[in-house]
């Protein structure tokens, strides 16, 4: 009887998860621009970037005019180590006081970490970490955690690594379901980066609360054309609940070859610029989101060395440029 009741409770939570994050409706008229600022934008993670406390960031996001925020679930922002029950209650109240929506927590995981060293249950460790993030998310008043897949390690069969990602997502998804939380898998890490592979992965995971945080950045760097990116959005339509934007310029790199009195081409360095000033085609991408009736927020992040530097004033200018840019889609 106890087992039956537990199973029913888990099923109920899964049903709640399905409704917690709205999927694209297929109707363009249902699309609304809802803006979100990622706290990584003011977290001091790249050379010269200013650092704000969590409270300073919340005040900043409100003053700039964002509808919601995405909080990085690691130091120096919202780390599990630092946020006990009292701190969680205080932060939740502060977000409500400012009239902001906590769109999601940003988790930082890698399900293939340690795949080359047997004996350590790294996939379980990652899943437990994500489960704790789900509890943190619930305590703070959101029902979504952004997560990753895994980086591909050399000299380990790909399918072994892929299977760990599937296993990890299934374990993490079931833990997150206890708190009514959806996991949004971002197309960021190596495993299942391409949209066809990501769709296959999520189909295989087959949990109602494991969805996708699908961005324009990686398909562009994969070399997809605007039309192919549009079709990628359509492919991912059954899963997209979140997206994060950032724009970049390509800076070519060369090394001098003394023997040939010439230069050899190297991989380009990407540098962040205000949205609309780089090579990413966000008009095409956001219009594709509109066409599928996307229901989530459009987040903005400054997580790489930014043109103009990392001063508060320059970060603010770039954030405001994003808000101005997305007005055309309202």
Regions picked out by a protein language model, each given a short descriptive name:
Residues 40-42, 74, 107-110, 150-152, ...:
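Active-site beta-loop-alpha junctions enriched in small/polar residues
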Residues 70, 104, 146, 184, ...:
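Conserved beta-strand positions in the central sheet of alpha/beta enzyme cores
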Residues 152-169, 175, 313:
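Active-site cleft segment of glycoside hydrolase catalytic domains centered on the general acid/base Glu
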Residues 20-140, 160, 167, 177, ...:
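N-terminal pre-domain/capping segments
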Residues 1-25:
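Bacterial Sec-dependent N-terminal signal peptides
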Residues 299-317:
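A short, acidic, flexible beta-alpha connecting loop/helix-capping segment that sits on the rim
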Residues 30-32, 170-279, 283:
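Acidic/histidine-rich catalytic cores of soluble enzymes
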Residues 136-158, 179-191:
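Active-site groove signature of glycoside hydrolases
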């Amino acid at each position: 009887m106890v087992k039956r009741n537990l199973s029913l409770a888990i099923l109920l939570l899964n049903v709640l998860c399905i409704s917690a994050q709205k999927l694209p409706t297929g109707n363009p008229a249902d699309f609304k621009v809802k803006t979100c600022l990622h706290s990584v934008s003011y977290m001091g993670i790249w050379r010269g970037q200013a650092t704000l406390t969590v409270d300073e960031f919340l005040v900043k996001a409100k003053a700039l005019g964002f509808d919601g925020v995405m909080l990085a679930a690691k130091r120096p922002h919202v780390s599990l180590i630092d946020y006990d029950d009292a701190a969680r209650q205080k932060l939740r109240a502060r977000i409500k006081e400012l009239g902001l929506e906590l769109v999601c927590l940003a988790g930082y995981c890698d399900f293939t970490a340690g795949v080359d060293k047997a004996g350590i249950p790294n996939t379980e460790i990652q899943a437990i970490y994500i489960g704790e993030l789900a509890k943190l998310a619930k305590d703070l008043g959101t029902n979504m955690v952004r997560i990753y897949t895994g980086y591909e390690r050399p000299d380990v069969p790909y399918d072994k690594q892929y299977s760990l990602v599937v296993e990890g997502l299934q374990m993490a998804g079931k833990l997150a379901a206890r708190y009514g939380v959806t996991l949004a898998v971002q197309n960021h890490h190596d495993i299942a980066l391409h949209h066809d592979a990501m769709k296959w992965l999520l189909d295989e995971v087959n949990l109602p609360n494991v969805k996708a945080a699908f961005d324009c950045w990686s398909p562009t760097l994969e070399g997809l054309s605007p039309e192919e990116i549009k079709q990628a959005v359509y492919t991912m339509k059954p899963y997209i609940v979140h997206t994060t934007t950032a724009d970049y310029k390509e800076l070519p790199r060369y090394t001098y070859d003394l023997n040939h009195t010439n230069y050899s081409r190297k991989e380009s360095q990407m540098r962040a610029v205000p949205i609309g000033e780089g090579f990413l085609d966000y008009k095409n991408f956001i219009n594709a989101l509109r066409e599928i009736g996307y229901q989530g927020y459009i987040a903005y992040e400054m997580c790489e060395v930014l043109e103009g530097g990392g001063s508060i004033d320059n970060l603010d200018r770039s954030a405001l440029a994003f808000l101005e840019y997305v007005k055309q889609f309202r």
